[in-house]
A protein has these predicted regions:
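Histidine/acidic residue-rich metal-binding segments in metalloenzymes
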Residues: 1-9, 22-38, 58-74
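Mid-to-C-terminal alpha-helical segments outside catalytic/metal-binding sites
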Residues: 113-164
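Active-site-proximal loop/turn and secondary-structure-junction residues that shape catalytic pockets
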Residues: 4, 14-15, 44-48, 82-84
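Sec-exported extracytoplasmic/periplasmic mature domains
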Residues: 5, 34-35, 65, 69-72, ...
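Conserved, mostly hydrophobic/aromatic
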Residues: 12, 40, 81, 147
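A conserved active-site cap/scaffold subdomain adjacent to cofactor or substrate pockets
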Residues: 34-57
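Short acidic/histidine-rich active-site segments
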Residues: 44, 71-96, 100-123
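Active-site glycine- and acidic-residue-rich loops that bind
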Residues: 14-24, 49-62
Length: 164
């Protein structure tokens, strides 16, 4: 991050202080991304958002809250990471086959990536229910302008700055 001459992003970068996964980032990394003007995208992939196999909407909001408090509203976005293999989209057998392939190929480790089923946070389990995050953020007390930043406004700002 220090060597970068411009904006840096963590497209799927949750806080390790909230969920101690090797894939989540320490606070100092998230702060460094923000100091470069970047955005950290909160991922909803179950093991990165909660230690519970069935995360709740509150788990997702708690991660967003922590990151907004840490780096500021202008540096938090969504990097949901919906994927083939998640519960509700394929059979358990297909999810297991995908997992075995990813582990056997060396792309994933069993220590960092638990075996399926992978249940996304309650209320936003599938892309078709993802809109429910808006209401949850508003109920939590976020202003409409801030929800718009989290949903994509911060990513659009970066695209404009990087690509003009």
């Amino acid at each position: 991050i220090e060597a970068a001459s411009g904006i840096v992003v963590c497209s799927h970068g949750n806080a390790r202080a909230v969920v101690p996964s090797d894939r989540n980032f320490p606070d100092e990394v998230l702060k460094a991304v923000a100091q470069k003007g970047g955005v950290c995208g909160v991922a909803g992939w179950p093991p990165f958002i909660s230690t519970n196999n069935r995360p709740s909407m509150d788990d997702m909001i708690r991660m967003i809250d922590y990151m907004v408090d840490l780096v500021g509203i202008d540096h938090v976005g969504i990097g949901m990471d919906y994927m083939h293999g998640q519960a509700g989209t394929v059979s358990n057998e297909d999810a297991e086959a995908l997992y075995e392939y990813l582990v056997d190929s060396g792309n994933w480790s069993e220590e960092t990536y638990p075996a399926p089923p992978w249940y996304y946070p309650e209320g936003i389990e599938l892309p078709s229910t993802f809109f429910n995050l808006t209401g949850a953020l508003l109920v939590r007390g976020y202003k409409k302008e801030d929800v718009a930043k989290i949903w994509g406004g911060n990513w659009l700002r970066i695209m404009g700055e990087v690509w003009g």
